Each structure stands twice: as structure tokens, then as C-alpha cells.
Amino acid sequence: RKSAGKPKN
């Protein structure tokens, strides 16, 4: 699942 932490951009 996707980790919701730091933005990829």
C-alpha cells in the first residue's frame, strides 16, 4: 500500500 508521509515532489 502507499505510504502517506512526505510528498514525492
Swiss-Prot record:
Co-factor note (free text): Binds at least 14 chlorophylls (8 Chl-a and 6 Chl-b) and carotenoids such as lutein and neoxanthin.
One Gene Ontology cellular component annotation held by this UniProt entry: photosystem I
Predominant cellular place of this UniProt entry's protein: plastid
GO MF: chlorophyll binding; metal ion binding
Residues modified as N2-acetylarginine: 1
Locations listed in the record: Plastid, Chloroplast thylakoid membrane
Claim: Plastid is one of the keywords in the record: yes
GO BP of this protein: photosynthesis
PTM comment: Photoregulated by reversible phosphorylation of its threonine residues.
Swiss-Prot/TrEMBL keywords: Acetylation, Chlorophyll, Chloroplast, Chromophore, Magnesium, Membrane, Metal-binding, Phosphoprotein, Photosynthesis, Photosystem I, Photosystem II, Plastid, Thylakoid
Membrane topology category: Multi-pass membrane protein
Keyword Transferase included in the entry's annotation: no
The organism's place on the tree of life at top rank: Eukaryota
Modification sites for Phosphoserine: 3
Record's subunit section: The LHC complex consists of chlorophyll a-b binding proteins.
Family membership noted in the UniProt record: Belongs to the light-harvesting chlorophyll a/b-binding (LHC) protein family.
Function: The light-harvesting complex (LHC) functions as a light receptor, it captures and delivers excitation energy to photosystems with which it is closely associated.
The record's note on its domains: The N-terminus of the protein extends into the stroma where it is involved with adhesion of granal membranes and post-translational modifications; both are believed to mediate the distribution of excitation energy between photosystems I and II.
Name of this protein: Chlorophyll a-b binding protein
